[in-house]
Amino acid sequence: TLLSKVPFYPQQEYFCGPTTLSEVAAYYGVDHSADSIAGLTFTPGLQGSPQIEMAAASRQLGFVAYEQRGSLSQLLQLIDEKIPVIVLQNNGLSWLPQWHYAVVIGYDLDRREIILHSGLTAEYRLPLATFEQTWQRANYWLLAMLPPERTSALLDPFLYTRACQDLLQTRQT
């Protein structure tokens, strides 16, 4: 399963957050460059984008920012529903983290791989076991950016309702 219509943009250094937001927004027909989004998310002192800023930027772009601690099963089911998902990974060690955002765009269960737009690589294939380790070290965080008219039965109703309320409070709809 592959969401081939999710565009890939090579990321600039430390811009994995804005780049993933730009890719998913473009998938839904909303074009914003990573540079323009970086003004909403990027924290120079951290050399990156905190999760709270990722969700806030999603709302500023007009999307429901559905965040949760996910599971591999849920992630694959969201892909089956043609919903690309932003994940946070720790590609370093627990005591020396290397945080990185990527967009999950597919999977191949026969080859036991997850497919990501990540960094400078489009359709990067990563063994599921490796992905689960890096995602686990980031507490299985996921962000599904959804247009306000889109939902999924896979999403926790309470968290989804809260995400919709957060969007309404930004007055972006």
Question: Where do the language-model regions lie?
Answer:
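Active-site-adjacent structural segments surrounding the nucleophilic cysteine of cysteine proteases
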Residues: T1-G48, N91-G92, D110, D156-Q165
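Extracytoplasmic/secreted envelope proteins and their assembly/folding machinery
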Residues: E13, G17-A25, A34, A38, ...
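Short, solvent-exposed, low-complexity loop/linker segments
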Residues: D31, D35-G39, T43-Q47, Q51-E81
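Active-site-adjacent substructure of cysteine-protease-like catalytic cores
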Residues: V64, Q68-H117
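Noncatalytic regulatory segments and standalone regulatory/sensor domains
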Residues: D108-T173
